[in-house]
From Swiss-Prot:
NCBIfam families: 16S_RimM. This is Ribosome maturation factor RimM. Binds ribosomal protein uS19. It is found in: Cytoplasm. Its main location: cytoplasm. The lineage of its organism: Bacteria, Pseudomonadati, Pseudomonadota, Betaproteobacteria, Burkholderiales. Residues 1-22 are annotated as: Disordered. Keywords: Chaperone, Cytoplasm, Ribosome biogenesis, rRNA processing. The PRC barrel domain binds ribosomal protein uS19. Belongs to the RimM family. It comes from Cupriavidus necator (strain ATCC 17699 / DSM 428 / KCTC 22496 / NCIMB 10442 / H16 / Stanier 337) (Ralstonia eutropha). Residues 145-222 form the PRC barrel domain.
Length: 222
């Protein structure tokens, strides 16, 4: 989540630490955990499984954001295996999506630990290590006033008060003090460029995530 005034939280989908690609434990995943249906279209990556937690099948998730409220709020997680090069004759179940219902979850020393139905022992929890955690956008908690989820800002057109199109939001940067919109644009010479616009009240005039429009006090020549 990002807040337009302070912007202290990192965007939800910006990885802080990447998994190191360690081989997973040789534990076949139960068929009941594998997800064969088409994945929901509104899935958002919110973290990855860093380790097993305890001996009763709990998993430890490293969130991609300081604010883990969306991860804690969702009761169903999709666990997708990251691309891994060099695996020969790997267990096919490793690559299949896993869908789990979360019985309980809580924050723990900068991580989120969770108990997933169907994951009953440490060996099975370790077999999930490295998988990315995805949840549906529809399962995010409602943001506070003047707060926005970064995923809702991506793809918004950005224009100024004069009606001049500045570009389209392609990403966000957290400089520690506030968020900065990365706005993809076309330069006068026809080449692709980028504008960096602080996501703060001094420059923001309106944000319409439903209409995918942002209006800012910003000139074409800035």
């Amino acid at each position: 989540m990002t807040e337009r005034k302070q912007g202290a939280a990192r965007p939800l989908n910006r990885p802080l630490v990447q998994p190191q690609g360690e081989p997973q434990k040789a534990c076949k995943l139960p068929a009941a955990l594998l997800y064969a249906d088409p994945l929901p279209e509104d899935l958002v990556e919110v973290g990855y499984i860093g380790a097993a937690y305890g001996i009763r099948g709990w998993i430890k998730v490293l969130p991609h954001a300081d604010d883990a409220s969306a991860l804690l709020h969702a009761r169903r997680w999709w666990l997708l295996a990251p691309p891994q090069a060099g695996l020969v004759a790997a267990d096919a179940s490793r690559a299949q999506p896993v869908c789990v219902k979360i019985a309980q979850s809580r924050e723990h020393s900068g991580t989120v630990v969770a108990q997933a139905s169907g994951v009953a022992d440490r060996n099975l929890a370790e077999a999930l290590k490295g998988r990315r955690v995805w949840i549906r956008r529809a399962d995010f908690p409602a943001p506070e006033e003047d707060e926005f989820y970064w995923v809702d800002l991506i793809g918004c057109t950005v224009s100024n008060e004069q009606g001049e199109l500045l570009g389209e939001v392609s990403g966000l940067i957290d400089n520690g003090a506030h968020q900065i919109l990365q706005v993809a644009c076309v330069l006068p010479d026809g080449k692709a460029g980028e504008r960096l616009i602080p996501f703060v009240d001094a420059f923001l005039r309106s944000v319409d995530t439903a209409g995918k429009r942002i209006v800012v006090d910003w000139g074409l020549d800035y």
